[in-house]
């Protein structure tokens, strides 16, 4: 008796299904892939529904005005309007411009250029204290 069988282990002739799969690989790869995609879309439907339900509860939550018991129909504050309202009460006739003394070494006429056209603070006789 021979130690090994003469018939090969993976014989395609033993089952006709294996021959069909070899000729049409879509049966082995395509159908399971499409099945997984369709099945997972149904499985994830519950998770997406939970997400939308949670967002809906956040939108329906109580606002700050309702929480504090304030009226929702009150006047909105406009910063520009409040500024003009507060400045209307101040008289412009009482305003007096006061010059702020500049530090020594800063040009008299602003800017970053220092030269003959912009005298430096502290270098002219009228700027000196002593």
Curated annotation (Swiss-Prot):
Alphabetically ordered keywords of this record: Membrane, Mitochondrion, Mitochondrion inner membrane, Transit peptide, Transmembrane, Transmembrane helix
Bilayer topology: Single-pass membrane protein
Subcellular compartments: Mitochondrion inner membrane
Chief location of this protein within or outside the cell: mitochondrion
Extent of the transit peptide: 1-23
Span list, region Disordered: 106-130
Listed GO biological process terms: mitochondrial cytochrome c oxidase assembly
Keyword presence, Nucleus: no
A GO CC term attached to the entry: mitochondrial inner membrane
Keyword Transmembrane: yes
Biased composition (Basic and acidic residues): 114-130
Ranges annotated as spanning the membrane: 26-46
Family to which this protein belongs: Belongs to the COX16 family.
Function as written in the Swiss-Prot or TrEMBL entry: Required for the assembly of the mitochondrial respiratory chain complex IV (CIV), also known as cytochrome c oxidase. May participate in merging the COX1 and COX2 assembly lines.
PANTHER family cross-referenced by the UniProt entry: CYTOCHROME C OXIDASE ASSEMBLY PROTEIN COX16 HOMOLOG, MITOCHONDRIAL (PTHR17130:SF14), MITOCHONDRIAL OUTER MEMBRANE PROTEIN 25 (PTHR17130)
Protein name in UniProt: Cytochrome c oxidase assembly protein COX16, mitochondrial
